[in-house]
């Protein structure tokens, strides 16, 4: 809150006062501290009562001020009054920009007496004031004082007899204690007084003022802080992806694969940055808190508070059904990994937030699970596992089990590894180091160097299988037999358990379903009435074959059956309360049961992960009937603690529907079926910010529209930039049901200075060229997917294809390879037998279901159209429409260690023909041919294989850089040994800014020592002056080293809402 009071000692010489209270005061103790600081600040002002009667003016303010709510900064309020001798402005919960603007106004005021009071939640170590967005520290204050405009105006003003006096009251500890009153360059122009002693007595006017401020600072209710969505609907994230949120002073990320979700930290802002995404999920399966800090827990604690408030409201009852459903929308929580211990303080400290988190978790019936590195050899915790889909492992690198210090104080460093079942799909490795010192992080990685999947930039299960490839036929046969066995052995369990769970969940999902039924007739305008076509092909192939394989009749024929199955109550089956979690096939349409004890104990999580925490999480919603038998097979087979994800198939026989873009894989896959491409769909390693989308939980497989921004070099941007809509191959299955699609668009934000950089076309990555105007056009054109696309069905808003239509080709690539060729299947081979799985459920009208795909820049340059607005989504007949989606494995390519999207700098990663237009669009499904990869299998030699030499590098797909006090310790050695396709710099604190340049220079030096030409993307979550300067000075080296720097303001748009985030798809 900022209050500005301007009074005048003489009528012509006014005085000024500015009070600032930042951030939400979320607890009573913090509110009392803020009020004490305000009182201290006002009473320390040595203004002459003859100049301004402060007591009287404060009384006038309380009775006559006006209140204004900011339309730009939601949650910010200003209270203002201008009297004869005093002008008062109070900003409640301001953003950092608002505070700096008001501070400039105060400095430029001609008043001879000025007071600045900084009060509010602040960090214990540095004293940095926490605001709604960002913080305010002495460094920010000096930056404002050093502003050229302010200095020039102050210097040009005729010097008064005595220079204006600015009194500042602020925290008395941390960096504020070291702020010198004498600011260079302001001597004789402005006199500063820091934290003077209290001089004025307490007064009635001051008491009234503080009472009114206390009322204005009442913390918002959890429902006001985390608002319900405008429309109810559940999302499903199928392909491996990671949302990178601006966590304020800390980290906030969200990893998802095949419907299994992991929230990593919560950020420092109580208005949780991840809320607008997770409120559309029915469950967050795991919460990983890397460290108990004020930079990582406030956002999570807000979510926990809301869950408690929802529970109380649900118990109290009342309210209309639809309204209650919208309010009681927060996802159920699974296991919570948290190392913490209790403490208490009025300042914002990690220990306080940890104590609060422990208390809230206890009230919710969730027992946090501490993490530490176990004995060697390192064994992972299996978070999720499903046959035919894959396995998600978590390796803990720090703290060690035998740590000398209390492990509750040590930061957790965790490595998530997704092992897909498809032999040619990419293994995904994501590192969340928290505040772990780099030296300890590297020590933890040494214990994992025996793992083959860390030795190569791109690894697939078939690489790791190596010599066992000859056994594929036998393996396929054994899988088939297991499937048959599963069908005969466990027929009844699903039909008993699921309806019970569904019945329990039904209240939460009644409204979304009802809304869907009402909305769909008006939205399905032009559906292709071919009911049989979609059913004659596997879903993966149908997805590749058409942008919109519609057919309203198909959905009408089957949807009612599959939708009602979960809701049919079976007598004698009590609702599952604390048993295994409801399978997603029911969670897709139904919300998870509101159990109070949601987390499974750690021993169960490790020993039988497949049964408790992962068995159900990968099932597709449409797999009610067709997939239940295979699921039973899974339940029988997954008792082992570390079963293999899937036995490799022959080279040409890829496993059927893998969970890349739709949750379809329920059973072991048959040999000979074309499968997904293994190349990294990493959508970020060179993407400037990606277009992304969650998938509806109500839908078996969502229509995956490859709606992306491929940024050509600046020279070509004006004429060749445009949105492309490539068709995805089997890896990204297109839906055969008549879904209406609301685009979920990520507005990329390339680094601001890129226009001044003359970039050569070859080494340029898509993220390093093009300006933000095109993206702002796009964002402006798509303020909400639901508002622009809903009136028309998908078949109207996208290039429409049916199974009988020829696949479109991009201009200039008449024979673009839709290519099953890229998936190990000859282009003209007959399609495989259709999968025996019912079609997906209809989609609720509020669901966002777009899968971001990336095309290489070469393909982007072939496409016409100079606009990146939503216009290209019109029908192909439109003259300005960019080419129809090229029927290719664009998504796969987009992830190719990102070098493939530039001019494919990976030396041996692509064959010479890959530089051609066709080759750039369809690659072999196997791993990108990486430089020095040895014979098949050498890349991913199993854990028992040859040991890597100490200090050898490890390859990751995405890695956060250590934050907190460890950020400044990141050096060249770290980047030499931790080689990631994407690095995320998060944590906008003062020390991070001070050490930023050294870290960025270390990145350049470390990358220069890599023996492989890999494209690297740097993703900052905050704006940094040091980074801007570094970018301008070193951008010429970025091209040579293959480094792309993104901006910090990427935006994801879903429906009629948007939130800041950068989505990285793998």
From Swiss-Prot:
Where are the residues of the annotated region Necessary for association with microtubules? 720-973
Stretches for region Necessary for interaction with RASSF1: 676-1066
Protein location? Nucleus; Cytoplasm, Cytosol; Cytoplasm, Cytoskeleton; Cytoplasm, Cytoskeleton, Spindle
The Phosphothreonine modification is found at: 647
State where composition is biased (Low complexity).
656-671, 880-894, 933-949
What keywords would UniProt list here? Apoptosis, Cytoplasm, Cytoskeleton, DNA-binding, Microtubule, Nucleus, Phosphoprotein
Region Necessary for the microtubule-organizing center localization: list its residue ranges.
Answer: 1-804
Any one GO CC term of this protein is: microtubule
In terms of one coarse class, where is the protein primarily found? nucleus
GO biological process entries: apoptotic process; axonogenesis; dendrite development; microtubule cytoskeleton organization; regulation of microtubule depolymerization
Q: Which residues carry this modification: Phosphoserine?
A: 320, 472, 582, 649, 660, 665, 667, 737, 765, 816
Q: Where is the signal peptide?
A: none
Tell me the segments the record calls region Necessary for association with actin.
Answer: 967-1066
Q: Which Pfam families match?
A: MAPB1_N, MBL_MAP1B
Q: Which family does it belong to?
A: Belongs to the MAP1 family.
Annotated function:
Microtubule-associated protein that mediates aggregation of mitochondria resulting in cell death and genomic destruction (MAGD). Plays a role in anchoring the microtubule organizing center to the centrosomes. Binds to DNA. Plays a role in apoptosis. Involved in the formation of microtubule bundles.
Q: What is the UniProt domain comment for this protein?
A: The N-terminus of the heavy chain associates with the C-terminus of the light chain to form the heterodimer complex. Its C-terminal part of the heavy chain interacts with ESR1.
Protein name stated in the entry:
Microtubule-associated protein 1S
Q: Which organism is it from?
A: Bos taurus (Bovine)
Q: Which gene encodes it?
A: MAP1S
